[in-house]
């Protein structure tokens, strides 16, 4: 059981350019089926270049300072379903989960809709 759904945020500039955040859209559709509220509890504070070409170590170090949880959005110890579109190294989800746990001491379950295997795994 979950209290809320939280999605991985996109930087405001990129969101304006694209017109939508795919993780948010997935969260909204899932919330309708699960009868849960979607809470915008995170923000992306930096508009860094895409991490798709970065090595695993670089992704983790770059992601740490990019995501911030917003205060007053969730109750403490909430059970959160954290949504992202694609899992590659896990750096984004780890950064978001750490920020949420640090500020809300919440319980987090992660759901992604795709996985990018490392080369040679397929």
What are these regions (language model features)?
Residues 1-81, 89-122:
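Conserved PRPP/pyrophosphate-binding segment of the phosphoribosyltransferase/PRPP-pathway fold
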């Amino acid at each position: 059981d979950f209290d809320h759904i939280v999605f991985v945020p996109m930087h405001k500039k990129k969101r304006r350019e694209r017109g939508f955040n795919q993780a948010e859209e997935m969260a909204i559709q899932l919330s309708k089926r699960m009868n849960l509220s979607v809470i915008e509890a995170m923000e992306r504070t930096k508009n860094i270049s895409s991490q798709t070409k970065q090595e695993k170590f670089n992704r983790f170090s770059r992601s740490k300072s990019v995501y911030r949880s917003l205060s007053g959005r969730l109750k403490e110890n909430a059970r959160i379903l954290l949504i992202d579109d694609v899992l590659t190294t896990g750096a984004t989800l780890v950064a978001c989960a750490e920020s949420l746990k640090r500020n809300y001491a919440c319980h987090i379950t992660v759901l992604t809709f795709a996985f990018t295997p490392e080369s040679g795994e397929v």
